[in-house]
Amino acid sequence: MSAGDSTRELAGRTLIMSGGSRGIGLAIAVRAAAAGANITLIAKTDAPHPKLPGTVHTAAAEIEAAGGAVLPVVGDIRDDATVAAAVEQTVRRFGGIDIVINNASAIDTAPADELPMKRYDLMQDINCRGTYLLSSLAIPALRESAQAGRNPHILTMSPPLNLDPRWAGACLGYTIAKYGMSLTTLGLAEELRADGIGVNSLWPRTTIGTAAIRNRPGGAERVATSRTPEICADAAYLVVTSKAADTTGNFFLDEDVLTAHGATDLDRYRVTPGDGPLTPDMFL
C-alpha cells in the first residue's frame, strides 16, 4: 500500500485523539477521516489562539469535509473526568474505539536552571500523564475491538528512546516529558501484546513546518527547511492500518515507514521545493 492510497480502509472504525486542532494532529485526523474513520478530538482550543490558527471546531469542520464523522470534545487532557467522559461518549456515539492517537504535547526547551516548575509540571501532565491517561482509559474498548477483529492500535507521537545525553543535557524537562510518552509505548506494547493491540510511537525525522514552529524565534527559517505535517499523517495511516498483532513495540520514523511501504518521492512533503538540506528533528 502506498502512502497515497485513497481506499476507505478505516470505514466504520473509530479514532480518538488528544489535541488535533492544528498541525500534525489535525493532518492525521483528516487523513484518517478521508479513509472513512470516525474521529473524536479532545482539545482545549474552544476559541482561537491569538497567534495560532485553528480550534477544535474548525478542525471538526475540516474532518467532516474530508469525509469523517466527528465528535469534538472541548476539554483538558490533564483532567481525568474530562478524558473518561470523552472515552465514554465516543463508545456511545460510534460503538467503540479502535485507534488511540496520543498527540497532545507541550514544549519548553529551557535548561534546568531556567525552567519554572509550573512549565515542567505542564509538560509532564500533558505529555506523559495525558498519554498514560487516555491510553489506559481506552484499553477496555480496544480489547473489545481486538476481540471483534477490528485491528486496534495505540499510536503515540514521541521519539525513540535515545540515551545519548545530548538531549537531556540541552532540555532536560522536555526530554523527560517526551521520553515518558515513549516509555508508555514500551510498557503498553508488552502489557497488551497478548490482547492483539498494536502499541507504537511515531516521530518525524525532520522538523515539521507547523504554525507553532513558525512562531518560535527563528521559526520562519526553520519552517523553510522542514517537511509538511502530511508526511506524519501518511506514516501514521500506514501504521494504524498494519496488522496490530505484528506491529507493536516499535519506535517508527515517518520517512522510514513510507519508504518501507514503497514510497520513493519524499520531496513532495518539503515546505520549500528543491533539494536543499532539511533540519533533523530532536532526539535523533
Q: Residue locations for each model-derived region?
A:
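A short, exposed helix-loop element centered on a Lys and neighboring polar residues
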Residues: 135-136, 186
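Conserved catalytic-site loops of classical short-chain dehydrogenases/reductases
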Residues: 14, 98-99, 121, 148-157, ...
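C-terminal helical subdomain
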Residues: 201-202, 219-284
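Substrate-binding pocket helix/loop in short-chain dehydrogenase/reductase
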Residues: 111-112, 116-121
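Catalytic loop of short-chain dehydrogenase/reductase
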Residues: 143-194, 203-207
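Short-chain dehydrogenase/reductase
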Residues: 2-94, 108
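Conserved Rossmann-fold SDR core element
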Residues: 32, 96-98, 182-185, 192-204, ...
